[in-house]
């Protein structure tokens, strides 16, 4: 079996810049949605791309495109699958040093994960490193 890479924390979260990643297929209104139409046609395909959302985006600024979850609950409260408001509170309280300017979303249904691992993840990691991210939280749905 492959070894899972592990990087231990060197600072407490109160000193870390934190990124959030959701698998709920979240995207900004006006931006390209995740390709769930292709997924409808090809049930063994899942969109391996990602979307970047500014942290200032509000509940009404985003949309959800996911065939495998009921997104109606997200439209009422995004924090169910992507606790942005909770982490902004942590930032105000000093529990984290900062929340990144960019928040990330991918699809949770990606049967062929090679494009995600070889293309999407490196792009996301490069962006996070550029923002000085020291910890990332993944919220799978």
Residue spans for each PLM region:
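Metallocofactor- and cofactor-centric catalytic cores in central/energy metabolism, strongly enriched
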Residues: 1-141
């Amino acid at each position: 079996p492959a070894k899972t890479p592990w990087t231990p924390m060197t600072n407490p979260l109160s000193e870390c810049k934190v990124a959030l990643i959701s698998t709920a297929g979240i995207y900004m209104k006006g931006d390209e949605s995740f390709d769930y139409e292709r997924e409808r046609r090809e049930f063994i395909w899942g969109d391996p791309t990602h979307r970047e959302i500014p942290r200032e985006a509000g509940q009404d600024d985003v949309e959800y495109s996911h065939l495998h979850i009921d997104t109606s609950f997200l439209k009422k409260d995004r924090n169910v699958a992507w606790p942005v408001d909770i982490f902004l509170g942590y930032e105000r309280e000093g529990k984290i040093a900062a929340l990144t300017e960019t928040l990330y979303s991918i699809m949770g249904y990606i049967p062929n994960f090679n494009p995600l691992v070889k293309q999407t993840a490196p792009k996301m990691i490069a962006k996070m490193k550029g923002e000085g991210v020291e910890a990332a939280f993944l919220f799978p749905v």
